[in-house]
Amino acid sequence: MRLTQGAFSFLPDLTDEQINKQLAYIVSKGLSANVEYTDDPHPRNSYWELWGLPLFDVKDASAVMYEISSCRKAKPNYYVKVNAFDNTRGIESCVMSFIVNRPANEPGFLLQRQDFEGRTMKYSLHSYATEKPEGARY
């Protein structure tokens, strides 16, 4: 099951050329970029591991692409994403995020249903990948 988080997630994987164009857009808007990775694909896992330091005041998209390449090389079977942060007063938020690397095999999620009082159903998601210990999931 393909993980769909962030921009472009329903499209085919971005090529390096397409990623470079998105990075050029991020840099042209004066946004700060950072690269993050994880092997826990749960949709509510919003705390991915930060790769290096955030790239503030970067004037060239190739610096961000270098960090992406380094992360991909070190973590080939992890999800890797780029975030763009706008520090403009009043916004101060992540304004763009997209996945740039994913594992070759994405096992998907188990939907667990639980019956509660009053015929209420509660649902939870469990990633098949997390059945293995961290670092050995893919």
From Swiss-Prot:
Quaternary organization: Heterohexadecamer of 8 large and 8 small subunits.
Organism of this sequence: Pyropia katadae
Similarity annotation: Belongs to the RuBisCO small chain family.
GO cellular component: chloroplast
Name of this protein: Ribulose bisphosphate carboxylase small subunit
Compartments in which it is found: Plastid, Chloroplast
Predominant subcellular localization, coarse grouping: plastid
Database matches in CDD domains: RuBisCO_small
GO BP annotation list: reductive pentose-phosphate cycle
UniProt keyword annotation of Chloroplast present: yes
Additional detail: In this alga, in contrast to plants, the small subunit is encoded in the chloroplast.
GO molecular function, one term: ribulose-bisphosphate carboxylase activity
Highest rank taxon of the organism: Eukaryota
Main function: RuBisCO catalyzes two reactions: the carboxylation of D-ribulose 1,5-bisphosphate, the primary event in carbon dioxide fixation, as well as the oxidative fragmentation of the pentose substrate in the photorespiration process. Both reactions occur simultaneously and in competition at the same active site. Although the small subunit is not catalytic it is essential for maximal activity.
Pfam families assigned to the protein according to its UniProt record, in alphabetical order: RuBisCO_small
Keyword set, alphabetical order: Calvin cycle, Carbon dioxide fixation, Chloroplast, Photorespiration, Photosynthesis, Plastid
Organism lineage string: Eukaryota, Rhodophyta, Bangiophyceae, Bangiales, Bangiaceae
Transport as UniProt keyword: no
